[in-house]
């Protein structure tokens, strides 16, 4: 299961979200209790494929399983920024602050492994629309 998930996330980060999501979903099917990061991979792939509702659903699953991991908050802020749902984006950013984290574009760019320039631009654009400061 984990090998499928890792392959899927790697494919997603490298610009092949449509292929990646198939592997991650296979990993979920093979594991009766999939770890939170499987859902994070599915959420990212959905986001990069512009399936924002599914992305939100999967990022929320990550938060349900592990509320202290920062990535789903980052990506939810970006999704909500793309959707123009600024109140929801601000909520995610305030949740990050409760965790003792603040997000900047610079930090968001430096701490993800998104290798595909189109996907990276979408993610950072969403953060900017959400009102995340550059530094």
Indicate residue ranges for each PLM-predicted region.
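Alpha-helical protein-protein interaction modules
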Residues: 1-135
């Amino acid at each position: 299961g984990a090998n499928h998930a890792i392959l899927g996330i790697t494919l997603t980060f490298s610009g092949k979200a449509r292929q990646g999501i198939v592997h991650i979903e296979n990993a979920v099917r093979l594991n009766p209790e999939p770890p939170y990061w499987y859902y994070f991979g599915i959420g990212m792939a959905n986001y990069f494929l512009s399936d924002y509702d599914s992305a939100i659903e999967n990022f929320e699953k990550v938060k349900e399983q592990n509320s202290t991991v920062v990535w789903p908050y980052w990506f939810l802020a970006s999704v909500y920024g793309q959707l123009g749902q600024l109140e929801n984006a601000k909520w995610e950013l305030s949740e990050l602050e409760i965790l003792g984290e603040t997000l900047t574009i610079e930090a968001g760019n430096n701490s993800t492994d998104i290798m595909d320039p189109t996907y990276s631009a979408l993610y950072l654009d969403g953060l900017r629309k959400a009102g995340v400061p550059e530094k």
